[in-house]
Amino acid sequence: MFDISQPQNGEDGDIKGFELAYQHAFRFLPAPFDNLGIQANYTYVDSSTPLVDAITGERLPLPGLSRDSYTLIGYYEDDTFSVRAAYTYRSKYLNSVGGAASGGNTYIAARGQLDASAQITLTPNLRLTLEGINLTKAIDRQYLGEPDRLTFSAQEDRRIFFGVAASF
């Protein structure tokens, strides 16, 4: 005898929301500040499914979908040098649905991360790059029902990359 299982699409679900984006280059500033700029975006999503939380009785959102997320970017860019810093955030989200006997649903906690990069063109044929990912060493957390019922926690390492691009 074999037990066979497979993913199955849900019957119904609702998603409502909006996204805002803004970008501005400060070209009106005196040199060298005229090469500065910012970018920002924000997304709000309200979702629901027919699935009901076994403990609270409330309708559950779509798994994997945060209610709030945003990115803030500051940059400087000219013909030979560029630098960029970006902070990205997403609010908690439902990871998986569980019954009352299992202690409830699992969620991934809110998380923010800072990344940065720089690039310099030394000659038309030689460019150096430096990139830092997760400079704030953000922590990934998963919990069961409530944030104080932690089931997983891992501090992501900061990653630094250096690159050389040459053309012949």
Please identify what each model-predicted range represents:
Residues 89-98, 119-168:
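C-terminal beta-signal and adjacent terminal beta-strands/loops
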Residues 7, 59-60, 104-105, 149-151:
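Short, P/G- and charge-enriched loop/turn segments at secondary-structure junctions
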Residues 67, 109-111:
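Short solvent-exposed loop/turn micro-motifs enriched in small/polar/acidic residues
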Residues 2-97, 136:
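Gram-negative outer-membrane beta-barrel transporters
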Residues 3, 13, 109, 128-131:
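Generic secretory/membrane-interface signal
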Residues 77-78, 108, 122:
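Structural motif
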Residues 115:
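Mobile, glycine-rich extracellular loop/lid and propeptide segments
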Residues 101:
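Acidic interhelical loop/turn segments
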